[in-house]
From Swiss-Prot:
<dbReference type="GO" id="GO:0005743">
    <property type="term" value="C:mitochondrial inner membrane"/>
</dbReference>
<comment type="similarity">
    <text>Belongs to the ATPase A chain family.</text>
</comment>
<keyword id="KW-0375">Hydrogen ion transport</keyword>
<dbReference type="GO" id="GO:0046933">
    <property type="term" value="F:proton-transporting ATP synthase activity, rotational mechanism"/>
</dbReference>
<dbReference type="GO" id="GO:0045259">
    <property type="term" value="C:proton-transporting ATP synthase complex"/>
</dbReference>
<keyword id="KW-0406">Ion transport</keyword>
<feature type="transmembrane region" description="Helical">
    <location>
        <begin position="164"/>
        <end position="184"/>
    </location>
</feature>
<keyword id="KW-0472">Membrane</keyword>
<dbReference type="GO" id="GO:0015986">
    <property type="term" value="P:proton motive force-driven ATP synthesis"/>
</dbReference>
<feature type="transmembrane region" description="Helical">
    <location>
        <begin position="68"/>
        <end position="88"/>
    </location>
</feature>
<comment type="subunit">
    <text>Component of the ATP synthase complex composed at least of ATP5F1A/subunit alpha, ATP5F1B/subunit beta, ATP5MC1/subunit c (homooctomer), MT-ATP6/subunit a, MT-ATP8/subunit 8, ATP5ME/subunit e, ATP5MF/subunit f, ATP5MG/subunit g, ATP5MK/subunit k, ATP5MJ/subunit j, ATP5F1C/subunit gamma, ATP5F1D/subunit delta, ATP5F1E/subunit epsilon, ATP5PF/subunit F6, ATP5PB/subunit b, ATP5PD/subunit d, ATP5PO/subunit OSCP.</text>
</comment>
<keyword id="KW-0066">ATP synthesis</keyword>
<feature type="transmembrane region" description="Helical">
    <location>
        <begin position="97"/>
        <end position="117"/>
    </location>
</feature>
<dbReference type="InterPro" id="IPR000568">
    <property type="entry name" value="ATP_synth_F0_asu"/>
</dbReference>
<comment type="function">
    <text>Subunit a, of the mitochondrial membrane ATP synthase complex (F(1)F(0) ATP synthase or Complex V) that produces ATP from ADP in the presence of a proton gradient across the membrane which is generated by electron transport complexes of the respiratory chain. ATP synthase complex consist of a soluble F(1) head domain - the catalytic core - and a membrane F(1) domain - the membrane proton channel. These two domains are linked by a central stalk rotating inside the F(1) region and a stationary peripheral stalk.</text>
</comment>
<keyword id="KW-1133">Transmembrane helix</keyword>
<dbReference type="Pfam" id="PF00119">
    <property type="entry name" value="ATP-synt_A"/>
</dbReference>
Length: 226
């Protein structure tokens, strides 16, 4: 195992060049289009998951919000697949990098805010000042609402980064403890190994849940601005 606890989060390189782009593009291979594979089990599962998720997320949207369906479904598939691939041994999880998550969160958030100011200008501006606010609290509330608006993409990115990173660190620590206890106390090592298996199963669920939460929050931001 790596001596450095955070070595697995370092950006991988090949011949001195970062290969993050190749890693990010790899999930697209896992979801081939139906033009190449017809009546394939993978395609059937993919379509069923997309339809189920789109029904849950997009029913609250109007016609303008429905135009984001393809983007949001692509987003949840991308984040979910990269999270799951990161659980494989000796692999790299791009979503543990805050810079990448900010690169996804900021443009999506900015797009929803832009739509709000473009199509519902008065309603978008009204969010900065709740109805019935006392006059002496108006400047403070405007500042607070402005800060809360700009914190939204940071919260999206930090939530995804923290949850995925914490899970990987726990797996790393428990895996290291299991190896260290094999020679000292095999019975204790067996217990920690069982805990490691259960934690890994939990991390598979967390990987999908975090992809769903990230996409759902973007969908809610979109709903507030359309």
């Amino acid at each position: 195992m790596n001596e450095n606890l955070f070595a697995s989060f370092a950006t991988p390189t090949m011949m001195g060049l970062p290969i993050v782009i190749l890693i990010i593009m790899f999930p697209s291979i896992l979801f081939p289009s139906s033009n190449r594979l017809i009546n394939n089990r993978l395609i059937s599962i993919q379509q069923w998951l997309v339809q189920l998720t789109s029904k849950q997320m997009m029913t609250i949207h109007n016609n303008k919000g429905q135009t984001w369906t393809l983007m949001l479904m692509s987003l949840i598939l991308f984040i979910g697949s990269t999270n799951l691939l990161g659980l494989l041994p000796h692999s790299f999880t791009p979503t543990t990098q805050l810079s990448m998550n900010l690169g996804m969160a900021i443009p999506l958030w900015a797009g929803t805010v832009f739509m709000g100011f473009r199509h519902k200008t008065k309603a978008a501006l009204a969010h900065f000042l709740p109805q019935g606010t006392p006059i002496f609290l108006i400047p403070m509330l405007v500042i607070i609402e402005t800060i809360s608006l700009f914190i939204q993409p940071m919260a999206l990115a930090v939530r995804l980064t923290a949850n995925i990173t914490a899970g990987h660190l726990l797996i790393h620590l428990i895996g290291g403890a299991t190896l260290a206890l094999m020679d000292i106390s095999p019975s204790t090592a067996l217990i920690t190994f069982i805990i490691l298996i259960l934690l890994t199963i939990l991390e598979f669920a967390v990987a999908m849940i975090q992809a769903y939460v990230f996409t759902l929050l973007v969908s809610l931001y979109l709903h507030d601005n359309t």
